[in-house]
Amino acid sequence: MNKENPTSSEEVLRFRYKNYKGEISDRSVIPIRTIVKKSQYHNEGKPCWIMVAYDLDKEEKRDFALQDIIKYYGII
């Protein structure tokens, strides 16, 4: 996979997500990797599991805290 320019042939994961502002939305992403790291936006700055993924709606690479995924819709 080209991480900077994912293609439509990649598997897309859909889920409902609550961001650090408390806003809830459905997201469509192409997962890149899962890591543990500190983030000012997640888990009060303590280390947590993060999915790094290409967000298809925002057209950029984003970090998603796994603990903030509310519901998985599956792979589409």
Model-derived features: positions:
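Core beta-strand-centered patch of the WYL/Sm-like small regulatory domain
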Residues: M1-I76
